Amino acid sequence: MKYEVKPSNQFKKDLKLAAKRGYKIELLTDVVKKLANGETLDPKYKDHPLSGNFGFYRECHIQPDWLLIYEIDGCELILYLTRTGTHSDLF
């Protein structure tokens, strides 16, 4: 199952900041490719749903303090990339 990837404007800004910080963007790209192909992420990524008002989003760890927040729309086959950054950036 292949999902169309749609990054939010905020995600694009977050990605520029991550690159400026020297993060290895290819690590994020690999995770996004797996998600877009409908693959289950390895346990090392600690993929889980968020709670509360953010319950329809999921979060995974690219690195221990580098997160990806995303949403999958299974009906329309869309992977929304919402945010990326550190815990302090996002929460």
Can you say where each PLM-predicted feature lies in the sequence?
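Enriched for short, Lys/Arg-rich terminal
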Residues: 1-4, 10-16, 20-30, 60-67, ...
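Generic detector of short alpha-helix boundary/capping microenvironments
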Residues: 6, 10, 40-43
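A short, surface-exposed loop/turn module that caps and links secondary-structure elements
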Residues: 34-61
